[in-house]
Amino acid sequence: MQREGFSENTVKAFLSDLRILTQYVGAGTAVRNISTNDLNHFVDWLANERGIPCNPKSLARRITTLKVFFGWLVESSVLLKDAAEPVVHKPVMTPLPTILSDTEFDAVLQVAQTLRRAEKPDARPYLLLTLLLHTGIKKSECMNIVLNHIDTSNPEQPFLWIRYSNPRRRHKERKLRLPVWWPETLAEYREQHQIHDTLFPCTARNLEYVLRNVADLTDLSKGLSFELLRWTCVVRDHRDGMPDDRLRQKLGISKITWREVRLKILRLTSPVL
């Protein structure tokens, strides 16, 4: 987990979950002797008999720990059979994220284009919106972009490199396609705002004000946020047929996190009955 860049808190939680399992089955029990029945009883004990409250989110995480641990033992040829695979995993679903409808999508871009072509033109709203809607990057990733992360050497296919200075986050680094017309907007923005190094040399709150202004001008009651635009990008990419693993990599998330994200995508894109 450390090699793959998981956070210190994630590693600590994983080890803590395994320690609880060890206490339950007994420190002298060989892992090959732990059965699916043992694990199901362990999950029931956590939920109902341990005497220490275990909320649904913690229980779901501990079941995930079992599946990851035993799955890894099978992949490493330590075990022949995955005892955790049949254990029922009911992920705890947080509320569905808010996204833009197709009509709202077109409306906010039209407002941003109007600002771009105004008497006192400002390309920043359009640049920011299109960047987020086409790449799905997070707020922190957006704030860390410097100009040399943007590759426009091939006019037919510009790219954005998402970089991390923290070695533990290097697994999140990725190369994302940008629209072919986006560098033109970038050039306008750079000239207007005298940008030479950091793409957005301001605070994140300042960019949130930019998004809020566009939402107000569009009469968009749900507002605009980095998270809303990220999820809008995700849902549109899924709807356009992007394969699951490619979409997961585009978002820079782990396979474990992807499980819940995918369920939310399916719920957001399923027809209303």
Residue ranges and their predicted role:
Residues 107-139:
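Basic, Lys/Arg- and aromatic-enriched nucleic-acid-binding interface segment
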Residues 11, 66, 128-129, 136, ...:
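Alpha-helix N-cap/helix-start motif at helix boundaries, enriched for small hydrophobics
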Residues 144-182:
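Conserved tyrosine-mediated DNA breakage-rejoining catalytic core shared by Y-recombinases
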Residues 77, 131-144, 240-242, 251:
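A short, glycine-centered helix-capping/turn motif at helix boundaries
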Residues 117, 212-249, 253-254, 267-273:
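Short, basic (Lys/Arg/His-rich) helix/loop patches that form interaction surfaces
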Residues 177-221:
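Active-site/catalytic core of tyrosine-dependent DNA strand-transfer enzymes
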